[in-house]
Curated annotation (Swiss-Prot):
GO molecular function annotation: peptidyl-prolyl cis-trans isomerase activity; protein folding chaperone; ribosome binding
Domain remark in the UniProt entry: Consists of 3 domains; the N-terminus binds the ribosome, the middle domain has PPIase activity, while the C-terminus has intrinsic chaperone activity on its own.
Protein name as it appears in the record: Trigger factor
EC number assigned by the record: 5.2.1.8
Organism: Sodalis glossinidius (strain morsitans)
InterPro entries: PPIase_dom_sf, PPIase_FKBP_dom, Trig_fac, Trigger_fac_C, Trigger_fac_C_sf, Trigger_fac_ribosome-bd_bac, Trigger_fac_ribosome-bd_sf, Trigger_fact/SurA_dom_sf
Cellular component, GO, one term: cytoplasm
SUPFAM superfamilies tied to this protein: FKBP-like, Triger factor/SurA peptide-binding domain-like, Trigger factor ribosome-binding domain
Amino acid sequence: MQVSVETTEGLGRRVNITVAADTIEQAVKSELVNVAKKVCIDGFRKGKVPMNIVAQRYGASVRQDVLGDLMQRNFVDAIIQEKINPVGAPNYVPGEYKTGEDFSYAVEFEVYPEVELMGLDTIEVEKPRVEVKDADVDTMLDTLQKQQADWKETTDAAGAEDRVTVDFTGTIDGEAFDGGKATDFVLAMGQGRMIPGFEEGVIGHKAGESFDISVTFPEDYHAENLKGKAAKFAVELKKVEQRELPELDEAFIKRFGVADVSLEGLRAEVRKNMERELKNAVRNRVKTQVIDGLLNANDIHVPAALVDGEIDVLKRQAAQRFGGNEKQALELPRELFEEQAKRRVKVGLLLGEVIRKHELKADEARVSALIEEMASAYEDPKEVIEFYGKNKELMDNMRNVALEEQAVEALLANSRVTEKETGFNELMNQPSAA
């Protein structure tokens, strides 16, 4: 077997392989002998068919199978010989084959990038210093009351926290546009669901009134044809409703399954949940900064095959979030997921090198702690812990989480870390890209 390796573009490689004619012929003869032992042909006993007849009837298909097998086996031998680590499925490019002659073919594929970690001491992290204060618990209790509130129709003018039912028709330069019309549209004010200016235009009006609202679509609006466009909405306000907040009494507290149905018991349970969320938020905020710093210091090429695979994963996750239509999700434009997929692949490759460099292995005590922390949010934590312990896939996933945390901590040890006083709501409203 003769082997040569070419670099095509970026991480692309092309291995050229030539298989000697006698190697092919020996393999064909050997396979024909195996076939002769199994075939049944009229006029001959099984296993007694003359080889020339076996070759005449099965030679072409056997030769084709042998060539396919040799191509795969020789490719494996070639990448072992050349110490190549391919990514994804290879593309075989067979050359012209003539009986009795050497056979040449090529295999095209991508390889993993060579990762050399750089700039780890330049990573800067601003760690939030934050605690759950009594005022934060008060705000959360207010939120819980609003979530459990009933709505009562009113003749008052619409306010910033009311719920309204409207009909509207939007136009741009006098022309209607797709998605610009709705009937009996229920809008809870103050949640930022509508484009800027729409809710403000509703405030102060009463049920039964009709009016126009002028707005401008944001430059980053998701619909390309509407970005930055000025629009007018003709609105009919059909109903205004105000919240009726429940009392913070025993009946209200029982809705949340709290053992101690006093207000103090509810506050304690709310605080415990907020502190758990806060711990995760601080951890995620630090992780995001570490990952961002790692990516900024190490701009690596990523194999397209890995990006494609990650895009498929993201599409399936999108399907699970929005109704489970996987077929429809897989048809979504790849551009929607490409940047996130590239980031994930880069992070995986870089953290993989951190793990290799530091010879990290998942800390089983950390794995157990992560499972216990996650299980504490459920009604029966013990049952959840036992379920994880019996499920190898879930345990492996949690070990990967632990290992990733350990890699981030290894990076954090060499990072420039400062602390910043931060409010609970400020931290919880910060996005996390990691």
